[in-house]
């Protein structure tokens, strides 16, 4: 999802 990668980056 949208927060999949962003979540890993901590964004």
UniProtKB/Swiss-Prot annotation:
It comes from the Eukaryota. GO terms for cellular component: extracellular region. Keywords: Amidation, Amphibian defense peptide, Secreted. The modification Leucine amide is found at residue 11. It is found in: Secreted. The keyword Transferase does not apply. Expressed by the skin dorsal glands. One of its GO terms (biological process) is defense response. Shows neither neuropeptide activity nor antibiotic activity. This is Rubellidin-4.1. The lineage of its organism: Eukaryota, Metazoa, Chordata, Craniata, Vertebrata.
